[in-house]
Amino acid sequence: MLSPKRVKFRKQQRGRMRGVATRGNTIAFGQFALQAQECGWITSRQIEASRRAMTRYVKRGGKIWIRIFPDKPVTMRPAETRMGSGKGNPEFWVAVIKPGRILFEMGGEEITPEIAKEAMRLAQYKLPLKTKFICLDEQEQPAGTKAAASSTVES
């Protein structure tokens, strides 16, 4: 399972998830992708379960890229422990996900849109967030590039 090799600080505060993903929100490697529709945490176990489901379905036909990494430690206290005596120990790692973030990408010579969609659907079942399947050719352009493209067409 995914986790950082070493971190500067063992424990982090939980934080807030506000706004949409400004980075990692476009397809960069493959032709098909799974994009988050809502915010939340995805654990390293959920990422691994999704990866296995997709890999098992496509077999050796294509390549899968994982675009998220669990770099936030979540601490927990032992059950039936009295209040006080400090913060608990890190138990597992999560990736903080905002809407619009690309979670997985898939590509390859033998990967058709139908195969990719079914593999991503199997991965969706393992995740705690709403997600959608997107293709490279039907992906919306970021705001700045759309304006630049339309201005070059008019001139």
From Swiss-Prot:
One Pfam family named in its UniProt record: Ribosomal_L16
Gene Ontology cellular-component terms listed: ribonucleoprotein complex; ribosome
Membrane spanning residue stretches: none
GO molecular function: rRNA binding; structural constituent of ribosome; tRNA binding
GO-annotated biological processes: translation
InterPro entries, per database record: Ribosomal_uL16 (IPR047873), Ribosomal_uL16_bact-type (IPR000114), Ribosomal_uL16_CS (IPR020798), Ribosomal_uL16_dom (IPR016180), Ribosomal_uL16_sf (IPR036920)
UniProt keywords, alphabetically: Ribonucleoprotein, Ribosomal protein, RNA-binding, rRNA-binding, tRNA-binding
PANTHER family (UniProt xref): 50S/60S RIBOSOMAL PROTEIN L16, LARGE RIBOSOMAL SUBUNIT PROTEIN UL16M
Assigned protein family: Belongs to the universal ribosomal protein uL16 family.
Subunit description: Part of the 50S ribosomal subunit.
Function: Binds 23S rRNA and is also seen to make contacts with the A and possibly P site tRNAs.
The protein, known as: Large ribosomal subunit protein uL16
